[in-house]
Amino acid sequence: MALCGLASWLAACSSTPPPEVPEKCDLQIVTSAVITSPYINPSERGEPRPVQVRIYQLKSDVGFLNSDFEEVWKKDAEVLGEDLVKAEEFPVYPDTRTEVKFERDDAAQFIVAAALFRNPTGKNWFKSFELPPSPADGQCGARCPDGECAEGPVLDPRFYIWIDDTRVEDGIEYADYFPEGGTLSAAPTEAAQ
């Protein structure tokens, strides 16, 4: 009888341990591909010029949407206040594709691409993109080579930004027409407008 009790006790101790909980992702790399037409940021004589682009990581884009160009250009930290998480600035040139990769801050819910044009018009000088859930909100799982998984969240999001004249737009439709390191060719008809 004691032998049976010992056998039961050993069987209970040797049961399969519970599965390990996957570790949370602690890093998300965001890629922004800025694609420019040959006609960006025209000078007074109509010649294309390079333009500075700022990529903002924001908690909310409402303050940005309610701001004007001069406010953001001259005093972005003051205007955006606590919504501003991080900002990065770099030049882009006519008829090019520039890829910028950065680590997403967990507090950021939006990225905004803003071009500091010579003569901006209306609200066309920026484009806001909502970020997928923060990596801290989900499980890591397997990294996906193309940035998207068949099931589950986008682990490393990619955004395409199109700049033409003095406009910043969602550039996904131009991604295939301007390969990385290439020049603009056979763009959709909207590119010529």
Question: Model regions: which residues?
Answer:
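Bacterial N-terminal signal peptides that target proteins for export
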Residues: 1-2
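Glycine-rich, aromatic-bearing surface loops/beta-hairpins
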Residues: 126-193
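Non-catalytic, glycine-rich low-complexity segments
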Residues: 19-32
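Structured domain cores in non-transmembrane regions
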Residues: 52, 57-123
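Short amphipathic, basic-aromatic surface patches that mediate peripheral association
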Residues: 32-44
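C-terminal motif of bacterial Sec signal peptides marking the signal peptidase cleavage site
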Residues: 9-12
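Envelope-exposed proteins and targeting segments
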Residues: 28-30, 49-51, 96-98, 109, ...
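Bacterial signal peptide processing site
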Residues: 14-17
